[in-house]
Amino acid sequence: MAEVRARVDFKVGAKSNIDAEILSFRGLKTDKEHVAVIFKQADQTQDTPLVRMHSECLTGDVFHSSRCDCGEQLEETIQRMGESGGVILYLRQEGRGIGLYNKIDAYRLQSQGMNTYEANNHLGFDDDLRDFTEAAQMLEALGIKKIRLVTNNPKKIRELAEYGIEIVEVVNTSAHIKDGNENYLRAKVSHGKHNLKV
């Protein structure tokens, strides 16, 4: 059974001005170092907190890549939760689970005209290798059973529900369109069935 290992105060956001806590876990299904970032002690003060499962994206979250909208989605969520509370489950699932180097290989194929899913398939991977069991384990360790899920991705909704988490509302993020990510976002809508207006 998963449990919280450590809970530490820190400040987050583009200007490091939003109070939050970062939590580590023990007893998760794998040895990946997933973390939770909690705003306004939402796990203890809210019956149905906002929750976002955000898969690690070094290129988008850290380097603000033009190829995706991951960093913008993360920052939008941090701002929203900084105001109203919530929980970000930051999952170490780079490139929809294929890993950083394979994602860079997929970028090369995307530069040659493939979309994000075609590139992953060409490299021998399924569309999405992520498993959200550990996200459910993290929520259980926090005592959270009902949530308002921040996502555009139907797979996340479906899998969390399968793991027994009650989703009372789905809150979509904005479409963060910029020069370089239009094809990526269109593929997420047409192929991944994401709820985005692009």
From Swiss-Prot:
GO molecular function, one term: GTP binding
Pfam families in the record: GTP_cyclohydro2 (PF00925)
Residues noted as binding Zn(2+) in the record, renumbered to the chain: 57, 68, 70
Annotated catalytic residues: 128, 130
Pathway: Cofactor biosynthesis; riboflavin biosynthesis; 5-amino-6-(D-ribitylamino)uracil from GTP: step 1/4
SUPFAM superfamilies with a match to the protein in the record: RibA-like
Entry's cofactor comment: Binds 1 zinc ion per subunit.
Keyword Hydrolase among UniProt keywords: yes
Cellular component terms (Gene Ontology): cytosol
InterPro entries: GTP_cyclohydro_II, RibA, RibA-like_sf
Binding site for GTP: 52-56, 73, 94-96, 116, 151, 156
Keyword Translocase: no
Catalytic activity: GTP + 4 H2O = 2,5-diamino-6-hydroxy-4-(5-phosphoribosylamino)-pyrimidine + formate + 2 phosphate + 3 H(+)
Assigned keywords, A-Z: GTP-binding, Hydrolase, Metal-binding, Nucleotide-binding, Riboflavin biosynthesis, Zinc
UniProt-listed GO biological process terms: riboflavin biosynthetic process
Top-level taxon: Bacteria
Cofactor dependency: Zn(2+)
EC number: 3.5.4.25
Segments traversing the membrane: none
Biological role: Catalyzes the conversion of GTP to 2,5-diamino-6-ribosylamino-4(3H)-pyrimidinone 5'-phosphate (DARP), formate and pyrophosphate.
Family, per entry: Belongs to the GTP cyclohydrolase II family.
HAMAP family per the UniProt record, alphabetical: RibA
Record-given protein name: GTP cyclohydrolase-2
